[in-house]
Amino acid sequence: MKKRGIFILSAAVVLAAGLLCRHMLVQEREPEFVFSYAENQTEDYPTTLGAKEFAKLVEKRSNGRIQILVQAEGALGTESDVIAQIQYGGIDFARVSLSQLAEYIPELNVLQMPYLYTNSDHMWKVLDGEIGDAFLAATDESELVGLSWYDAGARNFYNSKKPITCLEDMAGMRIRVQESEVMVDMVEALGATALPIPYADVYSALERGTVDGAENNWPSYEAMNHYEVAKYYTVDEHNRVPEMQICSKNTWNKLSEDDQKMILDCAKESALYERKLWTEREADSKEMALKQGVEVVELSAAEKKRFQEAVMGVYEKYCADYMDVIEQIIAQNNK
């Protein structure tokens, strides 16, 4: 009986050891896929944190089979470079500005028309519905897969010269814009000179006087320390341009249908996470900028209407074939 007990105990120990070794082998097994993710913002920026949440969700739900390595601060190139690389599979995933993406997919210009949305609720009602889904699908012809919409807040003007309180104050201003024809035309329609300059070079351009001002959201203004060299911030909310999470079609086609669905679900969940972070960060960034002595001007409703009327030519130039979609977007605000 004693020998039998010892045998049973020994067998149990061997079995347990075997299970432990098997568990360790599973844990140490190389992932089936290791994908790259390009992000040009800082490590603590909402879009970067959203990307990391996306990567974490994918790794967890794939049981470690799929890893996504997020590389922030423009480590993989400018947004324009990243889009080009994603098209041929050199980069797998990215979060990019719609202004950059519209250079490849012209119909996306609709979503960056100035003064298109009344507020953020209006924008999300559009993007989280059928209209937004149709625009995500529009990436297909450019060797891309649109996954989800990230928040980038409302863009406003800021400068180093004077408070902008009316349309006439824009005259003669040299304003940095993204590399986007729509943004260039919008700024010039307002009477200023638009100068496309890489995002990372804006601080030095403001400091040297190469430009008088720029336009961006509160978190970008604060994160890049632009308040140090441009203390006049005018809230006009000329653009609510969302960001899009995209995947290379080359990468997408390597995945099973189940993995594709899982990644889409993770992307949409990470977008909700990012939007929450954005709202919090926007409030914090504004508070910090105010503490640094930034002078904030809120355009009056009457003056904002003048700004809106000044840019109507931009709609006619870029969206003549999409006015029905624009009407649908505007109508969403009344539902």
Where are these regions (language model features)?
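N-terminal secretory/targeting leader peptides
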Residues: 2-121, 131, 139-335
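Thiol/selenol-based redox catalytic cores and closely related redox-interacting motifs
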Residues: 136
